[in-house]
Amino acid sequence: MSRPRRRGRDIHGVLLLDKPQGMSSNDVLQKVKRIYNANRAGHTGALDPLATGMLPICLGEATKFSQYLLDSDKRYRVIARLGQRTDTSDADGQIVQERPVTFSAEQLASALETFRGDIEQIPSMYSALKYQGKKLYEYARQGIEVPREARPITVYELLFIRHEGNELELEVHCSKGTYIRTIIDDLGEKLGCGAHVTYLRRLTVSKYPVDRMVTLEHLQTLVAQAEQQGVPAAQLLDPLLMPMDSPASDYPVVNLPLTSSVYFKNGNPVRTTGAPLKGLVRVTEGEDDKFIGMGEIDDEGRVAPRRLVVEYPA
């Protein structure tokens, strides 16, 4: 029986997309997948339809390493509407309460301080977290509220940008699992007036360079240019991709000689020099430092394979 043919190109890398407002992260993902004609694609942490900004999209083998970006810290710019609380904690929801805005500058500064550092956060019912196998927002849309446990998060930096009338603008540098909508909702309750998000932009993810972000419009323009020039679209699109191992760029690198890497790629732990004492590592092979997967240092100090790059035939 013949092996089923994979649909699309074997293209591997990470595209830093500047997500437009009003589209779901999955809709954007599918558009990018079609533009690149990629056989596989996945994003690394959804943005709400209201939100814009950096959405790393992994293509091909890079999807295996997207989990490491989910664990990375992120930075956001957010504008909140004070005096109104909504059921979703953002402007897409229904207003459930309106109160006057009467706090002082000192009270605002004091309230903001309580959200800095290591804190606990109860996720919104309008989130993709699951309860008994079902997403929270699915319960919320049915008018059902289920118990949620507070989760530890870290807010590394919470910058006050401006407060004008009923608008408050902040910049937030936070750990994985942080819901900006929940921070704004909780802040509004602490200030006694209620609040919801009207604008949210993800500025950075991990250490990815902001100047490498591209829009859907730019991708579509490149496809049109390629057609006009009579060249494959891939010739203009592929240089936009970050390396497939970039989601794991925070991990140390272990380079294996070719004599050892063959065993590693076959699923065997191997001994090496210069490896850290424990933890995950990026594994490369040979003098050209070709990335071959993620490994973990075992109890005997060997590098054991955890996620391997599959080398497809041309």
UniProtKB/Swiss-Prot annotation:
CDD domains with a match to the protein in the record: PseudoU_synth_EcTruB (cd02573), PUA_TruB_bacterial (cd21152)
tRNA processing is among the record's keywords: yes
UniProt keywords, alphabetically: Isomerase, tRNA processing
EC number, as in UniProt: 5.4.99.25
SUPFAM superfamilies: Pseudouridine synthase (SSF55120), PUA domain-like (SSF88697)
Gene Ontology BP, a term: tRNA modification
Superkingdom of this protein's organism: Bacteria
Reactions catalysed: uridine(55) in tRNA = pseudouridine(55) in tRNA
Chain sites annotated for binding substrate: 43, 76, 179, 200
Record GO terms (molecular function): pseudouridine synthase activity; RNA binding; tRNA pseudouridine(55) synthase activity
Active-site residue numbers: 48 (nucleophile)
Family: Belongs to the pseudouridine synthase TruB family. Type 1 subfamily.
Functional description taken from the UniProt entry: Responsible for synthesis of pseudouridine from uracil-55 in the psi GC loop of transfer RNAs.
Protein name (record): tRNA pseudouridine synthase B
